């Protein structure tokens, strides 16, 4: 049981951990100022809690979320939703972001300011060329490198956090930004979306099921117990890491001009490493971040390419891998801040939909729900999410007013009450169904 738990924990850790996630907690710490604890609570809830819960619920159906969504909503919606999800955790956001994080955290601090632009082009060219070659012939070597280096990198980050807290823990924090002053918990909750882990959990739950079955559980009780125990361990571990990094960002001195540029997390991670371990530590940090990000990039190209080839088999896997690598390369050269900025509206649509799907699946494990009720619930959440972004991005006052009139809108959760009401109504509407039981594969 302990061995299986350790192996499962390593699996979950590998799924969630990405060097890109390291920049968001310290950024939150810097920008949240005096509202730190409310902000980090929101971040941990969406960045860790939702991700772990989504993966756990996904492992309770060996056929994955595509089967759950097809049965409860509609097959066409499952395809549209998963295509949008894979494009988000693939070529549009996560793949280019891993490359730019590796460059911004590891390489850029060692270059002069007039070399950062050309440096990014050269770095991403070499980076994506190597990732593409490996994605055409994925091997266990990549997985083994990731399994070894990821825990090592995590331990080093923990050491950085502890030493940073001892050195800077009494330093006065920055003043909170306008967004965090208005709603610290809500802004922190939205920042947690940037980790992309809840979306990745939907995609990787089938992989998790396959790996778990290979461990040879004796019965369903042992299987479920292991999932929940390890899920709790991973949640506590990541929460501690995120809180530590955010605390470091909250107290580490950051110049005003860095804050004005957006995302001071890169600055905190790089400069704190040099301040605590010395200037030569930047070289080691560059190597660790680059390799960790690289394994993630290659893995995402493979998983996204395989999904699209399986879903739309007219094109070969090689074509999809080529296209997604090129898209990732082009978007990466827009820069980290640009990638984060344009990803926010999409994530603010996909995350509420993902959350309500997970809620529906959980409730439906215990109680029969009306299919039309579930469909209307997802439709309502989708509509509210689109309306919220429409009002924000295009400054349509009447749309924003309607959204802001909903409960919890100030906490960035205007869809929450409609979702709960929809699930409640699904208990009483006709055409009820209940989730299928699963069995452990022998």
Q: Whereabouts are the PLM-identified features?
A:
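Selective recognition of specific alpha-helical transmembrane segments in multi-pass small-molecule
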Residues: 49, 53, 152-164, 227-253, ...
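TM-loop-TM module centered on a large, flexible mid-protein loop between adjacent transmembrane helices
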Residues: 65-71, 241-294, 345
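Membrane-water interface regions at transmembrane-helix termini and the short interhelical loops
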Residues: 60-64, 68, 126-149, 214-217, ...
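Membrane-interface loop-to-helix entry segments
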Residues: 135-164, 343-355, 374-383
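Hydrophobic, small-residue-rich membrane helices and short re-entrant helix-turn-helix hairpins
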Residues: 137-148, 185, 208-237, 255-268, ...
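Hydrophobic, membrane-embedded alpha-helices of multi-pass small-molecule transporters
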Residues: 9-17, 163-170, 179-245, 284-293, ...
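A generic transmembrane alpha-helix motif of multi-pass inner-membrane proteins
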Residues: 167, 370, 374-442
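Hydrophobic alpha-helical segments and their helix-loop junctions in multi-pass secondary transporters
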Residues: 91, 95, 154-180, 198-199, ...
């Amino acid at each position: 049981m302990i061995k299986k738990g350790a192996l499962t924990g390593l699996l979950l850790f590998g799924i969630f951990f990405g060097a890109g996630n390291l920049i968001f907690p310290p950024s939150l710490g810097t920008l949240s100022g005096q509202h730190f604890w409310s902000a980090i609570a929101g971040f941990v809830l969406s960045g860790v809690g939702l991700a772990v819960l989504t993966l756990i619920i996904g492992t309770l159906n060996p056929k994955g979320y595509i089967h759950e969504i097809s049965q409860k909503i509609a097959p066409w919606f499952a395809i549209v939703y998963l295509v949008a999800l894979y494009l988000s955790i693939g070529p549009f956001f996560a793949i280019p972001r891993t490359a730019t994080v590796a460059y911004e955290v590891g390489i850029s601090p060692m270059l002069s300011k007039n070399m950062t632009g050309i440096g990014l082009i050269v770095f991403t060219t070499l980076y994506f060329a190597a990732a593409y070659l490996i994605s055409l012939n994925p091997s266990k070597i990549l997985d083994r490198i990731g399994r070894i280096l990821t825990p090592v990198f995590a331990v080093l980050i923990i050491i950085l956090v502890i030493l940073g807290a001892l050195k800077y823990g009494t330093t006065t924090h920055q003043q909170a930004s306008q967004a965090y002053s208005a709603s610290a918990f809500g802004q922190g909750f939205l920042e947690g979306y940037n980790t992309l882990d809840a979306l990745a959990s939907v995609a990787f739950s089938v992989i998790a099921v396959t790996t778990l079955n290979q461990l040879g559980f004796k019965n369903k009780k042992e299987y479920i117990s292991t999932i929940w125990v390890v899920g709790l361990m991973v949640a506590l571990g990541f929460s501690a890491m995120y809180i530590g990094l955010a605390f470091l960002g909250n107290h580490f001195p950051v110049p005003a001009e860095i804050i004005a540029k957006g995302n001071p997390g890169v600055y905190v991670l790089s400069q704190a490493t040099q301040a605590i371990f010395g200037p030569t530590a930047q070289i080691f940090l560059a190597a660790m971040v680059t390799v960790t990000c690289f394994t993630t990039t290659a893995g995402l190209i493979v998983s996204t390419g395989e999904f699209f080839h399986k879903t739309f088999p007219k094109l070969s896997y090689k074509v999809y891998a080529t296209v997604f690598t090129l898209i990732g390369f082009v978007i990466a050269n827009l820069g980290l801040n640009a990638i984060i900025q344009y990803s926010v509206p999409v994530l603010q649509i996909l995350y509420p939909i993902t959350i309500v799907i997970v809620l529906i699946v959980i409730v439906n494990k215990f109680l029969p729900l009306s299919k039309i009720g579930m469909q209307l619930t997802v439709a309502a959440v989708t509509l509210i999410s689109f309306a919220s972004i429409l009002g924000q991005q295009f400054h349509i006052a009447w749309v924003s007013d309607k959204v802001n009139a909903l409960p919890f809108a100030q906490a960035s959760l205007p869809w929450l009450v409609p979702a709960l009401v929809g699930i409640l109504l699904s208990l009483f509407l006709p055409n009820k169904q209940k989730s299928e039981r699963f069995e452990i594969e022998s």
